[in-house]
């Protein structure tokens, strides 16, 4: 296919137009008074959301050059979401601010490479200062505050704090749709291990790239499955029952994996395959843990069992299983309390007898998985549209809370980014262009505060001017229209979210500034369909 190429100023201007179109859409959602965005769906009702990454991913622009600019900003949002789980709107606002200022200076004749170096220096100084002013998460109230700010709901904040209290900061918390209108929390038997699906064609939710199995059977084995004939009688029985299947095996190779994938795509039955967790003897022990939890039997030569002889009653079961590319979460295993308790007692005795700190640590991890359970947040709402929007907010809040536990928290509402300006001002560029890059980041740091104020109906410049004359952590609370200590008021952001948003924004914006050519495909004209000739007159 033929290509069209734009150079220098023309290329950057086209990219910036795309940046602006996406950012102007996303930034209306930032802050407690942020608006919602309605997204058209290819089928069904439209989505109403204020989730930055969801909006960014849904935008496709007609102009190919503008679309490339939009996709670069969406990448900053997506990377921030992948690392920190939230902060996508902040990343978008910062990317636009740095890119806009940078483009002005490059157009005026500044060297983009020098500007990029300045941006990188300023970003490092800002990130270092963020870590210095960060607070550790030490109480349930602080967890609730982080979640409440992210979701704009004290009710959701309290729910997530309760969930973390019940299963621990490192515990497994999942989100499910409720059949009622209330959002509730429950703790069920379950565990999570760090193995994901063997093929992306096994996913059932393409937006989240997850595979969800309801009331599935679970085949647990330490063997390799390479010949589909070994498990064919078992598969046929499962298909007849209309059930889904999770296969946990040493590996699935040869014709077995493509055969399973083909049957999944054709809709014969819902199947997901994952590799068994752990290695060596630890792998066998972990498989026994999963078997105890789900009421299954490990198909292993150690017990004289063969795959071809496996019966349905040797399979485990669970209420729900969610598999991502990196992990598998089992919720509501069908194992008996007696079997689980017996397994727990065995592990506790092994911990007492172990003389190796490393072995003890691994045994304690297994014990925690068997005894900790899984916290399930059942999301309720009156309508399907409201349910989706509420679920997005709870997912963001949960991710924010985990980020705060990892790296602590800073004053929210964009206040922390303005507070680090002093540290950035102390950074001096070696050249005029480097200094220009530093100044660009300095101006961009105030962009989130400006936008939060404007979304609340205030003049962003007036709010910013007043904020820059306040002590650290004193900021503008857009929710109450008051000036107060943001940390004391519970308006806090995870340090990891703020840091990641700034780093990704600076990285993508710097790439935009140093772009000298953009290559796009020229769409081939659609050939007109041949017109049919006039038919012969019908005889009488």
Swiss-Prot record:
GO CC list: cytoplasm
GO aspect biological process, one term: protein refolding
Binding site for ATP: 29-32, 86-90, 413, 477-479, 493
Pfam families found in the cross-reference section: Cpn60_TCP1
InterPro entries: Chaperonin_Cpn60_CS, Cpn60/GroEL, Cpn60/GroEL/TCP-1, GroEL-like_apical_dom_sf, GROEL-like_equatorial_sf, TCP-1-like_intermed_sf
GO molecular function annotations of the record: ATP binding; ATP-dependent protein folding chaperone; isomerase activity; unfolded protein binding
Alphabetic keyword roster: ATP-binding, Chaperone, Cytoplasm, Isomerase, Nucleotide-binding
SUPFAM superfamilies: GroEL apical domain-like, GroEL equatorial domain-like, GroEL-intermediate domain like
Catalytic activity: ATP + H2O + a folded polypeptide = ADP + phosphate + an unfolded polypeptide
Domain of life, per lineage: Bacteria
Protein name (Swiss-Prot/TrEMBL): Chaperonin GroEL
Species whose genome carries this gene: Lactobacillus helveticus
Lineage, highest ranks first: Bacteria, Bacillati, Bacillota, Bacilli, Lactobacillales
